Design a protein with these regions (language model features):
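Charged, alpha-helix-forming regions
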Residues: 1-205
């Protein structure tokens, strides 16, 4: 379960009035499902530097996810933070701090099986809200869970494969919509297939 392999750290609020051309790097929850992909090395927004001490931060390697969204699919959308410096996160974001490959965790959070499990813990009100206490019970596949070195090596191998598919899918600047759609479906199929081995505590089929 996610709660067994890491911890969730909630961000702190900042508003549109706090934005500035320079200052503290921040991730707003709305940017995660509109402007970020699987991972990010640079923040897209900044707030006034005098807010620095009042904010809460994600560190390099954390996976930042949203807890609200207009759709159930948007809720829990994740981005692995790979920037050299920490980044402040909005209070509708959580930083998942763990010891796994951050891109691997981010890819896992995109799979159909994870989304299906995640939806069990979404409170469907005017704004869909993710219950972190529930999300912490969701499992992700951990290769070789009893051998950290081997596990990290396998996570890196899977990430390298998925990175290639992700680059192919998202780097298309021209092409027929049908071709792009087919490539996206192919990517999603192989991503889910690569990440479909038994989760800790489950027996192999």
């Amino acid at each position: 379960m996610l709660g067994d392999i890491g911890e969730f750290i909630r961000g702190k609020r900042f508003t549109k009035a706090d934005y500035a051309d320079s200052g503290v790097n921040v991730i707003h929850y709305g940017e995660i499902y509109t402007r970020y992909g699987v991972f990010a090395e640079q923040a897209l927004s900044r707030v006034r530097p005098e807010l620095a001490d009042s904010l809460r931060y994600a560190e390099r390697g954390d996976v930042v996810l949203t807890d609200v969204g207009e759709t159930v699919e948007d809720v829990g959308k994740a981005v692995a933070w790979l920037g050299d410096e920490k980044v402040a996160i909005h209070d509708h974001c959580y930083a998942f701090r763990h010891s796994m490959n951050p891109k691997y965790v981010s890819y896992c959070m995109q799979t159909a099986s994870f989304i299906a499990e995640k939806t069990k813990y979404v409170a469907r009100t005017k704004v869909n809200t993710l219950l972190i206490s529930g999300l912490s019970k969701v499992k992700i596949p951990v290769p070789y869970p009893n051998d950290l070195e081997r596990s990290l090596a396998e996570q890196s191998r899977i990430v390298a494969i998925l990175d290639k598919f992700d680059a192919l899918t998202n780097s298309i600047s021209e092409g027929l919509p049908r071709e792009i759609e087919l490539r996206q479906k192919q990517y999603e199929y192989y991503r889910d297939l690569l990440l479909s081995f038994p989760k800790p505590g489950e027996a192999a089929a």
